[in-house]
UniProtKB/Swiss-Prot annotation:
Species this chain originates from: Xanthomonas euvesicatoria pv. vesicatoria (strain 85-10) (Xanthomonas campestris pv. vesicatoria)
Full protein name: UDP-N-acetylglucosamine--N-acetylmuramyl-(pentapeptide) pyrophosphoryl-undecaprenol N-acetylglucosamine transferase
The protein's annotated pathway: Cell wall biogenesis; peptidoglycan biosynthesis
InterPro entries assigned: GlcNAc_MurG, Glyco_trans_28_C, GlycoTrans_28_N
Gene3D superfamilies: Glycogen Phosphorylase B
GO biological process: one example: cell wall organization
HAMAP family: MurG
GO cellular component, one term: plasma membrane
Gene designation: murG
Similarity annotation: Belongs to the glycosyltransferase 28 family. MurG subfamily.
Length: 431
């Protein structure tokens, strides 16, 4: 078993005298972590404690403690792209991770568990199911990740950022920062503007080399139109981006990071960016039109699926990342830079897709399930393809867990002491 804990001094394992926390499973990328942090902020504002389960040495171990949220971590990593030998050993590693996650759940005794995706979410969600903690899933992308696909089969509620990800989903949206959701309507910002067209290019925290190359080339080919340009490029690619604009003879403000994204969106007439779920949620909340260039290597091409949702509402233009990107970007910019009416129409269309209260809605649903649950599994149910079910028995008031008849998969002991205690009960033999 490998479990480590951060910020344990800030919040000890809950006792019967304390309110039981909500556990968030999220990690690996900002796309999973930041929605979890947004929901955690809402829950804590309501007086609900939050605890986090992540993976060793992953991004969440640096970000989550900054918010004074206790985090436990598992020794787990992704399986995609691994060699045959490592894949053959994966079941053993997953079983160990589920066992370790069960240890954490018995220690933290969460009143509900929600997965936003990431390496630790799989073992954490399976342990929650086996121990009877109410489990929810929030999927940010239109093309669901592997972990949430599995967990969705036996989660109590399946929440999504975009419609069309799962059957029986609840499309609540992706959480965005309050200051972005509070921006004035597009017409209040854009109508009557004079001067150069303001273009905001977002490469994300890691930068986007394709945008670093295509945007300067496209603008130079347009004959240096009257444009005011801000390009967020990430720290690692800053020198490369500055050199590309210098070579193209295009003036641009190149920034590795933008601290005030609300002000940046309010400033922009048009955004050129990738199509991550959180970025698109911000574009909609702000109400700004965009040219979307999905990351070509994204898992299951999920960024293209995300972008298609905005394109279908006439809120964005989609360009594929390939060798002709600069030429096609030049053509699109030539049209949009000269057409303020089209830009305003795209901005209004984006705003109609916004779900600015997503974090509040997710928190509401978590607490609905936490309030209705007693720390025991829900009624017998089985979702297609997984074969996991919970059977209620009356012997000593315990629950018997069956996993497709395979006792080797029963990683969490099924005696009454191993289950999450009922509210108000003592922690019993929990470590």
């Amino acid at each position: 078993m490998s479990v480590s804990a951060h910020a344990a001094q800030k919040m000890p394992a809950p006792s019967s005298a304390m309110m039981r926390p909500v556990m968030i499973l999220a990690g690996g990328t900002g796309g999973h972590i930041f929605p979890g942090l947004a929901v955690a902020k809402v829950l804590r504002a309501r007086g609900v404690p939050v605890t986090w389960l992540g993976a060793d040495d992953a991004m969440e171990t640096r970000l989550v403690p900054q918010h004074d949220i206790p985090i436990d971590t598992l020794a787990i990593s992704g399986l995609r792209g691994k060699g045959v030998v490592k894949l053959l050993g994966a079941p053993v590693r997953v079983m160990r991770a589920v066992r370790a996650a069960g240890f954490v759940l018995r220690k933290r005794r969460p009143r509900a568990v929600i997965s936003f995706g990431g390496f630790a979410a799989g073992p954490g969600g399976l342990a929650a199911r086996l121990l009877g903690a109410p489990l929810l899933v929030h999927e940010q992308n239109r093309a669901p990740g592997m972990t949430n696909k599995v967990l969705s089969r036996f989660a109590r509620r399946v929440l999504t950022g975009f419609p069309g990800s799962f059957a029986g989903e609840e499309a609540v949206g992706n959480p965005v920062r309050a200051e972005i959701a509070a921006l004035p309507a597009p017409a209040d910002r854009l109508v009557g503007r004079t001067g150069p067209v303001r273009v905001l290019v977002l490469g994300g925290s890691q930068g986007a080399r394709a945008l670093n190359q295509a945007v300067p080339t496209a603008l130079a080919a347009l004959g240096h139109p009257e444009v005011e340009l801000r390009h967020q490029c990430g720290e690692k690619l800053r020198a490369e981006a500055e050199a590309a604009y210098l070579q193209a003879g295009v003036n641009a403000s190149v920034e590795p990071f933008i601290a005030d994204m609300a002000a940046a969106y309010a400033w922009a007439d048009l955004v050129v960016c990738r199509a991550g779920a959180s970025t698109l949620a911000e574009l909609c909340a702000a109400g700004v039109g965009s040219v979307l260039v999905p990351f070509a290597a994204a898992v299951d091409d999920h960024q293209t699926r995300n972008a298609e949702y905005l394109v279908g509402a006439d809120a964005a233009v989609l360009l594929k990342q390939d060798d002709s990107l600069a030429v096609r970007l030049q053509q699109v910019l030539q049209t949009l830079l000269a057409d303020p009416t089209r830009r305003l129409s795209m901005a209004n269309a984006a705003r109609t897709l916004a779900k600015p209260d997503a974090a509040e809605r997710i928190a509401d649903i978590i607490l609905q399930e936490a309030g209705s649950g007693d720390g025991q599994p829900p009624a017998v149910q089985e979702r297609a393809g997984l074969g996991i079910r919970n059977k209620q028995t009356h012997k000593q008031g315990s629950m018997q867990t069956s996993v497709n008849g395979d006792r080797s998969a029963q990683l969490i002991a099924t005696n009454p002491q191993s289950r999450l205690p009922n509210p108000g009960a003592s922690a019993g033999g929990a470590p």
